Amino acid sequence: MEQIDKQKIADAVKVILEAVGENPDREGLIDTPMRVARMYEEVFAGLKKDPSVHFDTIFEEQHEELVLVKDIRFSSMCEHHLVPFFGVAHVAYLPQNGRVAGLSKLARVVDDVSRRPQLQERITTTVAEIMMEKLKPLGVMVIMEAEHMCMTIRGVNKPGTKTITSAVRGAFKNDDKLRSEVLALIKHN
C-alpha cells in the first residue's frame, strides 16, 4: 500500500478548522494539521499490514485444550464518524493437532485489524476468520468490549456505555460447556 499522504491530510484539517470558524494560523493551532496527519498515520497503520502474517510461524506442541488471551487492549477509529473506540478483546481457541501460535501473535492480529477505519463487528469477525484460516483450530471465540466515542461525545451522549460483540466458530459454536468455560474465564480475575 502507498504511504499515507500526510500533507493532504494536513490541508484537509486546515479546511475543517476554517469551516468551523477557527483560525488555523493562530498560536495553538498552527501545527495542529500536521499533528493530526501524523496521528492518522499511526492510528491507521493497520491499513498497510496483512494481519495474517503473524500466524506464518506455528509451533507444534502437545496441547489440544483451551488457549485464552484476555484483556487485550485495543483502539480503533469508527469508520462512520472518524472518532475513536477502544476497549478489550478476549481471544480463545482450541488447538488441533498441536498447532499453537505465540501468545503475542494474538494481540498483534487484534492490533493490525483494529488500526484502520473500522467497525467493532468487523474486527471481531476478521480476527476469528484469520485464526480459523491460519491456525486451523477446532474452534475460535473472539469477544470484544468497547466504548465508542461516537456514542459518548455526540448523538445520544451516553458516556460509559459498552458494546460487546462476539464471533464464535467451530467447536465453540456447538458446545455450550466450552463456550461457558471461556465466558467464566473471561470474568475470572
From Swiss-Prot:
Pathway: Cofactor biosynthesis; 7,8-dihydroneopterin triphosphate biosynthesis; 7,8-dihydroneopterin triphosphate from GTP: step 1/1. Zn(2+) binds at C78, H81, C150. It comes from the Bacteria. It holds the Pfam family GTP_cyclohydroI. Its EC number is 3.5.4.16. It is an enzyme of class 3 (hydrolase). Signal peptide: none annotated. NCBIfam families: folE, PRK09347.1-2, PRK09347.1-3. Belongs to the GTP cyclohydrolase I family. This is GTP cyclohydrolase 1. It comes from Listeria monocytogenes serovar 1/2a (strain ATCC BAA-679 / EGD-e). The lineage of its organism: Bacteria, Bacillati, Bacillota, Bacilli, Bacillales. The gene is folE.
